[in-house]
């Protein structure tokens, strides 16, 4: 059983609270979203957030999850397979400008020919709210990682942070494809 320092335990509690809020929001927003694609995206990300919450609970209980890093990589691999295939096709077609981003090609967010419908405006609001959450949570993990003495704990938290960044990429890609980014 691992004994966390007071600071480490406090950081884990903070991260747990953030993950709990993410789980609740993704579940609620999956119900509120109008677009079936967005409902599925929210539900999928929400499931990942449940795993993050379980990991943090285990850590708070003094258990070091043994497979967390591998599970994160496997989950990201499964979620990212379609994106990687599409990215490969894009690279073959010579598309540029997405260096460092493994998300699929999206149109210029400022090039929407029609205004957003009221339903799309509501979906855009949900996406913007969750994107802001993902940015905040990812930054929280980034700061927290450096406060842990255990390399294994840092690795686990780093894996979760990477997943949070991927969620942000997925939300951005959806928003940009639907003319919602900057709307």
Language-model segments: residues:
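Conserved alpha-helical segments that form or flank metal/cofactor-binding pockets of metalloenzymes
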Residues: 36-103, 165-179
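Absolute protein N-terminus
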Residues: 1-2, 183
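Intrinsically disordered, compositionally biased tail regions
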Residues: 151-165, 169, 173, 182
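Acidic/histidine-rich alpha-helical segments that form the ligand environment
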Residues: 8-32, 92-159
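N-terminal leader and targeting sequences that precede the mature domain
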Residues: 2-62
